């Protein structure tokens, strides 16, 4: 029995010295393997009497069980130690400051467009979106732009495949074509509602006013610090029976003061020329404070809608009158955020764009 106790003690000591699962398996082989100590003891029972075999075998089995218990205990201890080491290596100190994750945000021009839409929406204007590939008729002819106008030149306009020789397709040079599209659909809907149907000729009956802005991307052959071949425009239109230039002044003054959050902002309307409005005016603003104080800055073009354009909307110009305006959201964003180079908005530099979050 002393011999068996010695074997069990030796096995326990060997198991305790094992520092890895591999070491433990090697120690196991010394005592429980095919050539291990327990196997040798079992082989030595061959020369014993039957009664001695029973006694000796039972004692050896008890010793084997004690060794297996010690083996399993050590195996579990090594597994626990390995898990603990892994947990410590992967531990997260919740008291440490978190890592700042950058959050995306809208582009400054998109923020400007949203602001424009919200302000005009509060004044009762609809927002209309239209195709960026436009026909020559909607982009020029319907807006009273003559065929020999410089804007139709390939030096100023991107022409694209499609269309016909007399009516080519192009990338729209302004978002005004959507005003025509919106007005034509507005008149058609009202004709149907009042039962006029497809009667030929201009509409001269009573009709709800047309109030709409058309923001979107536009394209021209131009590129410098203040111009881009792709830029944004927002055109506005208000047509009714009693709309005057006074309404234009009121609407745009209220818009500018709301947009720039400045009640002391001063506006002036300078006489100008646009083929689709008559009379026409450039709109300048003057800040009374800040880095731009005292300077006149051009922000929009405007005017009373030309009678030919009213006709192209399907309306009778002797009854309906209105005003239109067009401004550059990119330009407004430059003024609002103090940016000097328009190209910065479109270079995709995250260091620049992240300032507007």
Curated annotation (Swiss-Prot):
Keywords: Aminoacyl-tRNA synthetase, ATP-binding, Cytoplasm, Ligase, Magnesium, Metal-binding, Nucleotide-binding, Protein biosynthesis. Its EC number is 6.1.1.20. GO terms for cellular component: cytoplasm. It comes from Albidiferax ferrireducens (strain ATCC BAA-621 / DSM 15236 / T118) (Rhodoferax ferrireducens). InterPro entries: aa-tRNA-synth_II, aa-tRNA-synth_II/BPL/LPL, Phe-tRNA-synth_IIc_asu, Phe-tRNA_ligase_II_N, Phe_tRNA_ligase_alpha1_bac, Phenylalanyl-tRNA_Synthase, tRNA-bd_arm. It is an enzyme of class 6 (ligase). Its cofactor is Mg(2+). The gene is pheS. Belongs to the class-II aminoacyl-tRNA synthetase family. Phe-tRNA synthetase alpha subunit type 1 subfamily. This is Phenylalanine--tRNA ligase alpha subunit. Binds 2 magnesium ions per tetramer. GO terms for biological process: phenylalanyl-tRNA aminoacylation. Mg(2+) binds at residue 278. Its main location: cytoplasm. Tetramer of two alpha and two beta subunits. It is found in: Cytoplasm. PANTHER family: PHENYLALANINE--TRNA LIGASE, MITOCHONDRIAL, PHENYLALANYL-TRNA SYNTHETASE. One of its GO terms (molecular function) is tRNA binding. SUPFAM superfamilies: Class II aaRS and biotin synthetases, tRNA-binding arm. It catalyses: tRNA(Phe) + L-phenylalanine + ATP = L-phenylalanyl-tRNA(Phe) + AMP + diphosphate + H(+).
């Amino acid at each position: 029995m002393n011999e068996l106790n010695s074997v069990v003690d030796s096995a326990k000591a060997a198991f305790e010295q094992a520092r890895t699962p591999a070491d433990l398996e090697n120690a196991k082989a010394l005592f429980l393997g095919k050539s291990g100590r327990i196997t040798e003891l079992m082989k030595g029972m061959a020369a014993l009497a039957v009664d001695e075999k029973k006694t000796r075998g039972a004692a050896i089995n008890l010793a084997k069980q004690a060794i297996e218990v010690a083996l399993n205990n050590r195996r579990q201890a090594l597994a626990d130690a390995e898990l603990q080491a892994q947990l410590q290596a992967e531990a997260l100190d919740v008291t440490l400051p978190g890592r700042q994750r950058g959050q995306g945000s809208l582009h400054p021009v998109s923020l400007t467009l949203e602001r424009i839409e919200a302000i005009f929406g509060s004044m009762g204007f609809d927002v209309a979106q239209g195709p960026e590939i436009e026909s020559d008729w909607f982009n020029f002819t319907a807006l009273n732009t003559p065929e020999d106008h410089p804007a139709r030149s390939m030096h100023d306009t991107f022409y694209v495949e499609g269309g016909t020789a007399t009516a080519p397709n192009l990338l729209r040079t302004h978002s005004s074509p959507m005003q025509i599209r919106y007005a034509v659909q507005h008149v058609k809907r009202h004709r149907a509602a009042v039962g006029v149907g497809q009667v030929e000729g201009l509409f001269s009956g009573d009709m709800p006013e047309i109030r709409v802005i058309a923001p979107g991307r536009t394209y021209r052959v131009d590129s410098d610090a203040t111009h881009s071949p792709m830029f944004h425009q927002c055109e506005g239109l208000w047509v009714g029976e009693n709309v005057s230039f006074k309404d234009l002044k009121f609407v745009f003054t209220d818009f500018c003061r709301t947009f720039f959050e400045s009640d002391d902002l001063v506006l002036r309307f300078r006489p100008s020329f646009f083929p689709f409005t008559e009379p026409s005016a450039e709109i300048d603003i003057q800040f009374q404070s800040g880095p731009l104080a005292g300077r006149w800055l051009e922000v929009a073009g405007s005017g009373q809608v030309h009678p030919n354009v009213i006709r192209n909307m399907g309306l009778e110009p002797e009854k309906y009158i209105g005003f239109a305006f067009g401004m550059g959201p990119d330009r407004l964003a430059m003024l609002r955020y103090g940016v000097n180079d328009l190209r910065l908005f479109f270079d995709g530099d995250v260091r620049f764009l992240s300032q507007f979050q």
